[in-house]
Each structure stands twice: as C-alpha cells, then as structure tokens.
Regions:
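A conserved segment at the C-terminal end of the G1
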Residues: 218-226
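Conserved lysine of the Walker
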Residues: 214
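Conserved C-terminal guanine-recognition region of P-loop GTPase G domains, centered on the G4
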Residues: 123, 130-180, 304, 308-316, ...
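Canonical P-loop GTPase G-domain recognition
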Residues: 167-210
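Beta-strand/loop nucleic-acid-binding surfaces
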Residues: 60-73
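Structural detector for short beta-strands of small beta-barrel domains
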Residues: 38-47
Length: 336
C-alpha cells in the first residue's frame, strides 16, 4: 500500500511496521538428498594440492573433492565414496561426493595457544610415538602430549624407541612400561618381526619429531616405499623435515601404516583439563586429595601433586610434563 493511501486510511505513515516488507528469498528445502550408498568406497592415502590419491579395491586413483562438500576437510585415512572415472588410468580424475563417518580422528593444534585444531589422520587404530634414544635426544614432554592426543582420539598408543644402538632404552621403557604403554625398540639391522606383529591388520600412524627415524622405519617395513630420510643437525640437535605430507602405505602382511611429517610442537588446546588428567593415569588418583576447585598448576595452593613429589610417590618430570600440557587448555565442562 502506498504512503498516500495509508494516510487517507488513517494509518500513521511514520509507523514503519505498517509497510509490507518483501519476504527474504531462500532456496526451497527438499528431503530428496543425493544418495551415494551405491558408490564404491575408497581410502585416501595421500593428498597433494587438492588432488586425493585413493585406494579402490586393488588399484590407486586420483580424485578431487566435490563442490557439495564445501569446506569439509578430507584427510589421509578417510573412507570416501567415489564416482566419475574410477579406472585409475593415467589422466583420469574421479570425484569425492561424500566422506564416510570417521571411527577416530587424531588432532593437534600448532601450539597450546592456537584455538584452531588440525585433523591429522582419520580412522587410525593405533599410533606409534616414534622417539629416538639419541640424535635427537628423547623429549618426554612430546611423548606425553602425543599420549594425551591418542587417548583423547580413542587410538591405542605404542612407544617406539629407535636408534637403540646409540643409547640405553631401559629408563624410558621402565617409565612408560609402568604406565601400561606398550614399548618396542629398534636398531639398524635388528629383527623387525615384533614391530610387524603389532602392525598386522591395523591402521597405524607414525608421529614424532623430525629425524627420529619414522621414514627409515617405514622404508624397512614396506619394501619400495621410497620415503626420503634425513639427518640431524649437529648444532641444533634437530632433524630436517623430509616428509612434507602424510602418506598411507599398505603393509605386506596386512594393515596400513601412515607416515606423517615431523613436528616440533604438539598443541593440546582442543583437549579439556579433565581429559588431560585422565591421560596421566598415575597422577589422577592423587588429585582426589586436592582441595575442591584445584587447578593442579604450580600456582595452585595445597595441590596434592606437589606433596606426592615431595614424598617420592611420583617423579618430578611427570608433574612438570602434566602441568605443561594443562597450562593453556580448554576448561573442563564442570568449570564452565
């Protein structure tokens, strides 16, 4: 109705609610969602600049993500529906219209202050925390952080100690063996059958610092893998990045192994304080003696964990590692 007609009808033309506003257009909703259930399922084995290498039955193919997936990430280990040209012939390109529900997702953040979590690998059954006994020196804090991420993701952790020819593994084996974390050791030329037994028929992701021997281990387990290996800088004690992206390879005896790029930090800002505490099974029972609302930090008065260290019930290095993980984490639901 025009303003003149509104005025003649006695309606206040200064009242903007009297005017009809055009309705906001929206796309019509439909219940007829695309059905991809008849499409074959492949597994993403590597990613390179928007192209996804997938294993379908007994051959590999290259695919691109369908526009309908939008910003949804597709990561190594994902099980995906495939359509288009799935022959795997040279120059062919398939399409990924749907990502199947993930059983597990291993995540990390760049550091403890980064709010953006990154999904590393999907559908892994276990994680090998690859740690060199020397060159570079083992870092307990890194081991504990990956353990927290593994438990949070519902993935079984295994501590894999490499370069056992350079240093004695007994101290780390005793520390983590007492926490019911399986431990295996490797050295150049040693029999890898114990490692193979743990990998058979499982999907295992290798995580660790650069230079600890992940690619070397993968090359030994998968003939023809061709993963580039590097060396450790004598001045910094750090390894050089040789793997730039995650890659999944099928094991000769069954199962999959996923190599990941070396990391220098493993942030846990996506994990709540309660879940971090649950990952430190040797410390959790002691916190029952803490005052109500205790945050278990260095500044927390009368924290029972400090008394436990004083009485030799827990090692100082365990408490230091726990508090490092805890410092910048998300609050627990009960604290919100």
């Amino acid at each position: 109705m025009s303003p003149r007609r509104l005025a003649s009808s006695g309606i206040d033309t200064d009242d903007y609610s009297a005017f009809d506003r055009p309705r906001r257009r929206s796309r019509p909703r439909t219940k007829n969602r695309p059905d991809y259930s008849d499409l074959p399922i492949g597994q993403v084995t590597s990613i390179d600049r928007g192209r996804y290498t997938c294993r379908l039955d007994d051959h590999d193919l290259v695919a691109m993500k369908a526009r309908s997936l939008g910003r949804k990430a597709v990561i190594v280990g994902d099980r995906v529906r495939l359509d288009g040209d799935t022959s795997g012939a040279e120059g062919s390109l398939a399409r990924i219209p749907q990502v199947e529900r993930r059983r597990t997702v291993l995540r990390r953040t760049a550091d403890d202050t980064d709010p953006h979590e990154r999904a590393i690998v999907a559908n892994a059954d276990q994680i090998f925390i690859v740690t060199a006994l020397a060159q570079p020196e083992p870092r307990v804090g890194m081991i504990d952080r990956v353990l927290v991420a593994a438990y949070d993701a519902g993935v079984d952790p295994v501590l894999c100690l490499t370069k056992a020819d350079l240093a004695d593994p007994d101290e780390l084996m005793e520390l983590y063996g007492s926490l019911d974390v399986p431990v295996v050791t490797t050295r150049p030329g040693a029999d890898l059958d114990p490692v193979r037994d743990m990998l058979t028929d499982r999907t295992t992701v290798l995580v660790g610092h650069s230079g600890v021997g992940k690619s070397t281990l993968m090359n030994a387990l998968v003939p023809g893998a061709g993963r580039t290996t590097g060396h450790v800088n004598d001045a910094t004690g750090r390894g050089r990045h040789t793997s730039t992206s995650a890659q999944a390879l099928e094991l000769p005896g069954g199962g999959w192994i996923i190599d990941t790029p070396g990391v220098r930090s493993f942030g846990l800002s996506h994990v709540t304080a309660d879940r971090i505490l649950a990952a430190f099974g040797d410390l959790e029972p002691i916190t029952a003696q803490c005052p109500r609302g205790c945050e278990h930090l260095t500044s927390s008065p009368e924290c029972a964990l400090d008394r436990a260290v004083e009485h030799g019930l827990i090692r100082p290095i365990r408490l230091e590692s726990f508090r490092s993980c805890l410092l910048y984490t998300s609050p627990s639901p009960r604290d919100l």
